[in-house]
Swiss-Prot record:
Homotetramer. It comes from Methanosarcina acetivorans (strain ATCC 35395 / DSM 2834 / JCM 12185 / C2A). The gene is gapA. One of its GO terms (molecular function) is 4-hydroxy-tetrahydrodipicolinate reductase. It is an enzyme of class 1 (oxidoreductase). It is found in: Cytoplasm. This is Glyceraldehyde-3-phosphate dehydrogenase 1.
Length: 335
């Protein structure tokens, strides 16, 4: 079977990780990545052997910088079966006509809204619904983290309601322009935050409300989650369900912070210190009748990366079984 030809439009925090993840698979390949300007990320992409494409008006700038562009973004799109759009939120919507004109499939990230594709994706929740689709949106890091925990609990115990409080990292580690650096910001003041409604774009029947704060850190998000279920359960029941999920990692051995989780990622030699899994403290799982609580940490730079790979596989119909795709992706990444 020929490999699916994938273009990555936007080579930033998510795009560079998606490109490497696609490259690691045996049923898909990267035909090119795009950058607007010949900055350090473009230089690294060039060193890694990726064909770089740029807006037509910027191709000359890449030539002058010593990293000749392989062509325009439009030319890259023409070579692809599917484009993974990893451009900043709002930019992806402007790119949609390019993909439609070229007749290629497209994936957007959670920075775009649900209507851009009409289908929001999470591998464990609705893989089969993405089979053969032309347009898909992979939900954000926080929504991905919530869906990964809600779905297996709902299947085993039935979820009556979810209440989630999200302490969101202020920005990514390489971002020197954003904050806060000495404040906690209500984000937003008016409740709910967008995360609850976004979960429902994937799992429509779930009753969920969310609240979010921005905190002065760049490492990870931290969720405090409360679920009420339909069935009596114990903390051990919840742990058993979570432990059955390959993209949930239990955190222990004295770890009480996101900093220590990132140190674990370094110590196990993850690329870019990535932690693709939800990180849950099993000691935090506390049951009160049919309600339970837990803490989980979400690595915003990487958690959606395997989801993008699975979305590609579903849309290109390379694998019809979601569980098999998840296993294949995980193995290729070394998860």
């Amino acid at each position: 079977m020929a490999k699916a030809k994938i273009a990555v439009n936007g080579y930033g925090t998510i795009g560079k990780r998606v490109a490497d993840a696609v490259k690691a698979q045996d049923d898909m390949e990267v035909v090119g990545i795009s950058k607007r300007t010949p900055n350090y990320e473009a230089a690294v992409a060039h060193q890694l052997g990726y064909d770089i494409y740029a807006p037509a008006e910027n191709v000359g700038a890449f030539e002058k910088a010593g990293m000749p562009a392989a062509g325009s973004v439009e030319e890259m799109i023409e070579k692809a079966d599917l484009v993974v759009d990893c451009t900043p939120g709002g930019v992806g919507e402007k790119n949609k006509p390019l993909y439609e004109k070229a007749g290629v499939k497209a994936i957007w990230q959670g920075g775009e809204s649900h209507p851009i594709a009409g289908f929001s994706f999470n591998a464990v929740s609705n893989y089969e619904g993405a089979l053969g689709r032309d347009l898909v949106r992979v939900v954000s890091c926080n929504t991905t983290g919530l869906c990964r925990t809600i779905t297996p609990i709902d299947r085993e115990l039935g979820v009556k309601k979810v209440r989630a409080i999200l302490a969101r990292r202020a920005t990514d580690p390489n971002d020197i322009k954003k904050g806060p650096i000495n404040a906690i910001v209500l984000h937003p003041v008016k409740l709910p935050s967008h995360h609850g409604p976004d979960v429902r774009s994937v799992i429509p029947h779930i009753n969920i409300t969310s609240a979010a704060l921005l905190v002065p850190t760049t490492l990870m998000h931290l969720h405090t989650v409360n679920m009420e279920v339909d069935t009596d359960c114990t903390a051990e029941d919840i742990k058993k369900i979570f432990s059955s999920q390959s993209r949930i990692r239990f955190i222990g051995q004295g770890i009480t912070s996101t900093a220590e989780i990132m140190e674990v990622a370094r110590d196990i030699k993850r690329p870019r210190n990535d932690m693709w899994e939800n990180c849950i403290w099993p000691e935090s799982i506390t049951v009160d009748e049919k309600e339970f609580y837990f803490f989980q940490a979400i690595h915003q730079e990487s958690i959606v990366v395997p989801e993008n790979v699975d979305a590609i596989r579903a849309m290109m119909e390379l694998e019809s079984d979601g569980a098999k795709s998840i296993e294949k992706t995980n193995k290729a990444l070394g998860m």
